[in-house]
Amino acid sequence: MTERNQTVISQFLLLGLPIPPEHQHVFYALFLSMYLTTVLGNLIIIILILLDSHLHTPMYLFLSNLSFSDLCFSSVTMPKLLQNMQSQVPSIPYAGCLSQIYFFLFFGDLGNFLLVAMAYDRYVAICFPLHYMSIMSPKLCVSLVVLSWVLTTFHAMLHTLLMARLSFCEDNVIPHFFCDMSALLKLACSDTRVNEVVIFIVVSLFLVLPFALIIMSYVRIVSSILKVPSSQGIYKAFSTCGSHLSVVSLFYGTVIGLYLCPSSNNSTVKETVMSLMYTVVTPMLNPFIYSLRNRDIKGAMERIFCKRKIQLNL
């Protein structure tokens, strides 16, 4: 890469969203309400799982961690976006940009690995129902969660350290609403080939491989379900996977649309819209998907609210 005039970059300017100035207040209110819904919805899921002993099972251990991951993932970008929408100079410090990259990768990958663990849980529940409790032991479940946290820590730290070694020039404008790693690489003055090679290798391991494992799990699940003689049994088996499959489709659908189906026309606008989908919309919808399609969650809400109502009456 040709070296340009280097200078010390203390902050980056985030161009944000392509919203006309006269519509800024409307979109600010919209994004604020979406963020608050995300926080409240995921907090409710976490609290329900903690308080209701009926939900102290492997599936809900993974779900509580996924809700925490979604809550934090949205919190990495949304507060800064909302702040910059009200600011005349939408900037972010250099250190803040690196921190945002780290936590964005960390919580994004954590949700990815937890979806794999949940797919394995559904696979065992449907394909080996008689051995479910012995296979999905507390030790294995905790190990899967800890492994997810360890792997995501390594991945996020690796990319953040590689990004920190780069030099940046006078151009400090990021055409995005957060510190997107690919946008930062385009601003770098120093050689980015190492970063690009590592991104290619790690994406293959941390995105494609988990997706392949989920697909393999569902191939086995569908194969087992089709062997069930009664239509009621088939419906019950599919209903246990419905929520997870919806979340998987939502998460990987936006990621595949963004990274594997590039568009030359309006690529910046497309990237921004797709990024909003998986940073704002998906974390907001996940609690609704699990609460509306899950009898256990709805039952836990009824038990806790009824118990609270009885206590108030006494």
UniProtKB/Swiss-Prot annotation:
Location in or out of the cell: Cell membrane
Family: Belongs to the G-protein coupled receptor 1 family.
Stretches in topological domain Extracellular: 1-29, 82-97, 165-196, 262-271
Sites where a glycan is attached: 5, 265-266
Record keywords: Cell membrane, Disulfide bond, G-protein coupled receptor, Glycoprotein, Membrane, Olfaction, Receptor, Sensory transduction, Transducer, Transmembrane, Transmembrane helix
Family annotation (InterPro entries): GPCR_Rhodpsn (IPR000276), GPCR_Rhodpsn_7TM (IPR017452), Olfact_rcpt (IPR000725)
Gene Ontology MF annotations: G protein-coupled olfactory receptor activity; olfactory receptor activity
Name of protein: Olfactory receptor 1
Its job: Odorant receptor. Activated by a lily-derived aldehyde as well as other odorants. May signal through an inositol 1,4,5-trisphosphate (IP3) second messenger system.
Membrane topology note: Multi-pass membrane protein
Ranges that cross the membrane: 30-50, 60-81, 98-118, 144-164, 197-217, 241-261, 272-292
Any single GO CC term annotated in Swiss-Prot or TrEMBL for this entry: plasma membrane
Stored Pfam families: 7tm_4
One GO term of the biological process aspect: adenylate cyclase-activating G protein-coupled receptor signaling pathway
Coiled coil (UniProt feature): none
Cystine crosslinks: 97-179
Location, primary (coarse class): membrane
Positions on the Cytoplasmic side per record topology: 51-59, 119-143, 218-240, 293-314
CDD domains: 7tmA_OR1_7-like (cd15918)
Tissue expression remark: Olfactory epithelium.
